[in-house]
Amino acid sequence: MKFSEQWLREWVNPDISSHELSEQLSMAGLEVDAVEPVADEFHTVVVGEVIECGPHPDADKLQVTKVNVGEDEPVDIVCGASNCRLGIKVAVAKVGAVLPGDFKIKKAKLRGQPSNGMLCSFKELGLIDEHDGIIELPADAPVGEDYRKYLQLDDNSIDIDLTPNRGDCLSIRGIAREVGVLNRLDVTVPESNEVTASIEDTLSISLSAAEQCPRYLGRVIKGVDLTRPTPVWMTEKLRRSGIRSIDPVVDVTNYVLLELGHPMHAFDLDSLEGNIDVRLAKPKEQLTLLDEQLVELDEDTLVIADEKKALAMAGVYGGKNSGVTESSKNIFLESAFFAPDAILGKARRYGLHTDASHRYERGVDPQLQRTAMERATELLLAICGGEAGPVTEAVAEAFLPKRDGITLRACRLAKVLGVSIANDNVTEILERLGFDVSFDGEQWQVGIPSYRFDLSIEEDLIEEVARVYGYNSIQAAPPAAQLRMTERKESQLSTHQLVDAMVSRGYQEAITYSFVDPKHQALMFDETAALTLPHPISVDMSSMRVSLWPGLVGAVAHNQKRQQSVLAFVETGLRFIPDESAENGVRQEAVISGIRSGKAHSEHWSEGDRPVDFYDVKGDVEALLAQTGNAAAFRFVASQNPALHPGQSAAIYRGSEKVGDIGALHPKFDKALGLNQRTFVFELALSVVTERPLPQAKPVSRYPSIRRDLAVVVDKDLAAGELIAAMENVGVKQLVDLNLFDVYIGDGVAEGKQSLALSVTLQDSDKTLEEAEVTELMTKFIETLKSEFNATLRD
């Protein structure tokens, strides 16, 4: 929000300097980004009147003038501006003047004609960059008066960076309220009178989309003359607020926007066909905007329409076909309240950003529409003439925002701020803020005005009290708190321990957004409905994640584009699964997820160069499961997952309960997800890896272990894990290790079969095993494999 300091001081004028005012606003939460003079330094520039003007005898593009500057004799000046003519009031730099850029005005001759000064343009005085001829001043500008004094150029433009919740301060009125509160001053509202209708013309208004637009006011104004210039006092206030003067109608609506904070729009009445309807866009409906851009409107876009066509994108941008031009004689003026949800994100969707959408997205005062209408009408009639009809209003009270009172507890206020503020002071602060206040000795009941739509809970009021009381007035004090030793169960693993275990294997911890791109998430989880945010940060972050994979995939894709060859990330966090049976309709599950892509390890002379594969990631997961002290309880079972490669994916089970997934991302997603190398992922429920049994000390056997190798031929599609699980379930207590060390398919093995070689390590804790006992145990294993898998010993 950029504005003129002098304009603000017309509303409230504290006895403090510009610097002190800026500091005061910043400390109250309205951060001042910049304070700049509205004009560069120059002097000896006065108001003049061209009393003679004729062509230069020796130059086609020059004119010879005599200018009255309030002295005994007029000044001879040669001018090259096309708009120089007899009778206009101008800005004259007299001999001796110094203009911006240290440009000094001296007596001179141009093509033989004396020139004792210069008729100035806005650019030459450093006011605006555009060079559109010399400055033309109003006819009542006093000849001879210093130009800086006449335009009050000893002023500053203040630029405030407002947080999104303070939409009420996107106006002079709103900032003046704040300054008045901070300085205990009343705000002087400029005098404005309600305009009495002088004609009976009206347009009826219907609200087909009442929820999106619960209040709409319109007024017909006829016989306006839009060729009249906008008064210099208004154009200067607009310029100092960063807005260029265009024409009287646009200037007035912009002025009201800055003064009151309420956007308005004007239509050419003669271009309208029938009455006004505020509705949602029809399928495939198109609108040519004021910038001549043709857009196809989405069906959730709110539009202002007549009986035949859409006229404007409500709260965002006007349409060209109904726009006001210099030749317009009759206009229809709009003042409406659009719900923030109806406008939010619409401008960005169509590649637009306007002052109107900026305010409507943050919220405007739902009670301000008539005030804005009367103010704009008054200004338009004063500048352009014409006659105004009565104000027509359509309102759906049920959809207008309702403000509930807020309770502020004295004990809560003191606890949060850490300082005790006298109850009378708190009451005074709340009343100065314009709130309705009652206090019963323990708590305040506070009624919130319609323009403070950012206040809804007790903490909001605590913040208001703190910033008006003054953060600097709150004395620093060391925090006082009781420190207690916390009990940490040895049977409970922390997420830090799990992440550290993965970091030790070369992973880096990542933190990604819980909001993800719905298109990318739908690719991987097309059968899982996701929660859609009503007010997303952006369209690309509008869905809650149903897995941590989308965020991790985005991190890998980002790094692959930056030539990173070894990528491994681990993350813990929540995934959000829609579930009507869960609290608030969403099931939040804590998980630990990982992703690997690129090379298996960094380049090193002692290591071969190979890409990461499924078994690298499976080994990482097994190391993670080993942290539980019960890795044997988990097993990997080949399964299908729509996000994963059908031949390189598995579900992770603990007993009969599925607790996670692992596999290679399906190659068909690589291009859409921005991946250029094979990528492997895993995800586990955090609850199953944070629990572990307490360690039990067992004596180490003093007797030797015995190894036997067992090679069996089984079906080619049989997973080795199933064989190992079957052997472990035989119940041989002497079995201490079982390991697959060879897989063979080829000569000597029948078609459709594979040879699996396992090492079996046996050891008894009480004695040395004899050969007969070992043979008996191995026979049990072989018989089990034969009966369950039709396995045969390999020759």
Curated annotation (Swiss-Prot):
Q: How is the cofactor bound?
A: Binds 2 magnesium ions per tetramer.
Recorded GO MF terms: ATP binding; magnesium ion binding; phenylalanine-tRNA ligase activity; tRNA binding
Disulphide-bridged cysteine pairs: none
| Predominant location category | cytoplasm
The UniProt keywords, alphabetically, are:
Aminoacyl-tRNA synthetase, ATP-binding, Cytoplasm, Ligase, Magnesium, Metal-binding, Nucleotide-binding, Protein biosynthesis, RNA-binding, tRNA-binding
Q: Where is the FDX-ACB domain?
A: 701-794
Q: Which reaction does it catalyse?
A: tRNA(Phe) + L-phenylalanine + ATP = L-phenylalanyl-tRNA(Phe) + AMP + diphosphate + H(+)
Where is this chain's protein located in or outside the cell? Cytoplasm
Return the Pfam families for the record.
Answer: B3_4 (PF03483), B5 (PF03484), FDX-ACB (PF03147), tRNA_bind (PF01588), tRNA_synthFbeta (PF17759)
Provide the GO biological process annotations. Answer: phenylalanyl-tRNA aminoacylation
Q: What class of enzyme is it?
A: ligase
The tRNA-binding domain covers 39-148
Q: Where are the transmembrane segments?
A: none
A cellular component term (GO) from this record? phenylalanine-tRNA ligase complex
Task: Keyword check for Lyase, yes or no.
Answer: no
The Swiss-Prot or TrEMBL record describes its family as follows:
Belongs to the phenylalanyl-tRNA synthetase beta subunit family. Type 1 subfamily.
**PANTHER family according to UniProt:** PHENYLALANINE--TRNA LIGASE BETA SUBUNIT, PHENYLALANYL-TRNA SYNTHETASE BETA CHAIN AND LEUCINE-RICH REPEAT-CONTAINING PROTEIN 47
Please describe the quaternary structure of this protein.
Answer: Tetramer of two alpha and two beta subunits.
Please identify the protein, giving its name as recorded: Phenylalanine--tRNA ligase beta subunit
